[in-house]
């Protein structure tokens, strides 16, 4: 007990010396977090031994000490990585390297030079909100290289430049949906109006829009531009759908009644056309079933039909065991199909229950023929697959695109089952890279390959959308299942499943 108290007092003295010296060096900040880590570990150990007080200091629960120790370890690793870069010689204070500053937007980034940004909604000074823009943001790229990027503000939000991309860490439209009634706002930086509210459509510089040159960096100039993000479209929809508006049309007006009657007439005509099409389909299916029953007694003239049996491959493959040399359906004006066969087997393919012959239209269809052709050898493998199905061991083994010619619907479904499976993981870039490196050491053999970290880019701009992504490919679905059961994904990482035609 006394030994723990003495060690705890030594750590307290070290922290006091760091606070009093206030050295703005990165070495001093690393020492500060190392001391905090030792303090959290000591308090954790004391709590495990049943000690509730060390002198006048109350010993927190185990979960609190564990969380503080992990936080100190994380900050210490980040600072040690920053120490190896060219920015280690810059002054770093306790505020710059605090956990609160590191976790503030943009999260998990070191930043300096806070600037106050005030956004006034609906041109009402009492309806305002304050944000923080950082002059410089430090981030790590995919190659573990540190970069220093300036931050800026425009009518869309606050961003920092990540290479050639604008990474928005504050979007004014998110709070405008809660605080604004008209969808307009005014942006003020250091009590200077940067963007005044005007009536316009979607701003071209918003994420997914076109780039705009009227943006403000760390020393913004006074300009005027559109300040609504998706404001006009939302406002129009609200005015048309909301009842009792001041300038809205009354529900009992003549135009509203005429539009309602037109809508009712359209819905009635649609329902009548649907009922007529259903009755036609029923009559056609009955006539086809009668012709099919009459043709069962004729063993020489057998057309080859294609059935659909609710997705069960076994029922479909049993109906493809016959070998018809040439079966052709000619389309007549009456909508009936006549078939002519040169040779056929004595065994008749059985029709599965619940199947439908041909398509839903009244025209005849050409069935798949197995007559000899120059591509018979290349189709030999697909024909055998359609006859016997796919074994579980072959699922996910194909690495080539599926051909759409001479395979039919069933053959394409069976060939697509051979596509290699993948897992798409989403998270922070550093987290995904650490997960990839850990998987190479611990889970080798449970996957085929990892991709690099990548991101989606807006169609009309250069902004990155969402979090970073990474693909994991496998040889089979069983391997992916084993990987999913064995591997423990990092916290904050989401995953989804899929497959590709080729890799």
UniProtKB/Swiss-Prot annotation:
Compositionally skewed regions (Low complexity) per UniProt: 213-234, 317-346
Compartments reported by the entry: Host nucleus
Gene Ontology BP annotations: DNA replication; DNA-templated transcription; regulation of DNA replication; viral DNA genome replication
Extent of Basic residues compositional bias: 243-293
One Pfam match: PPV_E2_N
Keyword Transcription belongs to the record: yes
Record key words, sorted: Activator, DNA replication, DNA-binding, Early protein, Host nucleus, Phosphoprotein, Repressor, Transcription, Transcription regulation
Cellular component, GO annotation: host cell nucleus
Main location: host cell
Region called DNA-binding domain, residue ranges: 419-503
Post-translational modification: Phosphorylated.
Molecular functions per Gene Ontology: DNA binding; DNA-binding transcription factor activity; nucleotide binding
Cited HAMAP family: PPV_E2 (MF_04001)
Subunit and interaction comment: Binds DNA as homodimer. Interacts with protein E1; this interaction greatly increases E1 DNA-binding activity. Interacts with protein L1; this interaction enhances E2-dependent replication and transcription activation. Interacts with protein L2; this interaction inhibits E2 transcriptional activity but not DNA replication function E2. Interacts with protein E7; this interaction inhibits E7 oncogenic activity. Interacts with host TAF1; this interaction modulates E2-dependent transcriptional regulation. Interacts with host BRD4; this interaction mediates E2 transcriptional activation function.
Family under the similarity heading: Belongs to the papillomaviridae E2 protein family.
Function according to Swiss-Prot or TrEMBL: Plays a role in the initiation of viral DNA replication. A dimer of E2 interacts with a dimer of E1 in order to improve specificity of E1 DNA binding activity. Once the complex recognizes and binds DNA at specific sites, the E2 dimer is removed from DNA. E2 also regulates viral transcription through binding to the E2RE response element (5'-ACCNNNNNNGGT-3') present in multiple copies in the regulatory regions of the viral genome. Activates or represses transcription depending on E2RE's position with regards to proximal promoter elements including the TATA-box.
Protein name: Regulatory protein E2
